[in-house]
Amino acid sequence: MTFILQMYRFICAIFFLAILQGCSWFATRTPEDPSNSGLGFKPPTTPDLVITNLQNAFTDNNAENYILCFTDTLINKNLQFQFTPSGEANARYASLFANWNINNERAAFLSMVSRLEQNSRLLLTLSNSRFDILLPDSAVYVSDYSISVPTVVTAFEKNYVGSMRLTISQIGNGLWGISRWTDSRNPGIDSTLSTWSILKGQYSN
């Protein structure tokens, strides 16, 4: 009888410990850090990785990774980012683009992401891409682009097309970034669609 009683107590103790351990199964789960999801940002040790990061920032809807694609004057004060908009965008948003800088880039991107349809993603597609110039400290990248923006703003377009010319420069520490950006309309692409410059202007107002 004593043996049976001891076994009963032992089994009860094991059962009680199992219940205590099981309580952790129902504990609130720590939310996953959003920065750990998506394609992420690769150290831009070459000009082509800058382009890869630019596309990934769109796919991930990640404004900070987008900004990391540009030159940083905190690292190299001689590399002030410059943006030249397409002709129609400059006519429409002349005062805005007169003093365009990295802060404007961030604000426009954040505004765009905040107005996306729920659970949707931006898409940047590049075509006819090439490096026109490749030097030890700079490169010039030319490409046509199309951008898909599934926005909830009915007054804004959802598709943009054009051509861009990017000067990608070494910013220090073996890293590269976009120092100059010239946007333009591509006459060979659907002229009814607006350029990237228009997109930036729309989401800055």
Predicted region positions:
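Surface-exposed, charged secondary-structure patches
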Residues: 88-157
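A solvent-exposed, charged loop/short amphipathic helix patch at secondary-structure junctions
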Residues: 30-37, 82-93
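Sec-exported extracytoplasmic/periplasmic mature domains
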Residues: 59, 71-75, 110-118
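Short, well-ordered alpha-helical segments enriched in acidic and aromatic residues
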Residues: 62-86
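Short beta-strand edge/turn micro-motifs at domain boundaries
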Residues: 24-37, 138-140, 146-205
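Sec-dependent bacterial lipoprotein signal peptides
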Residues: 1-24
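Short, low-complexity N-terminal intrinsically disordered segments enriched in polar/charged residues
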Residues: 23-60, 68
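Extracytoplasmic/secreted proteins, especially bacterial periplasmic and envelope-associated proteins
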Residues: 46-49, 53, 65, 100, ...
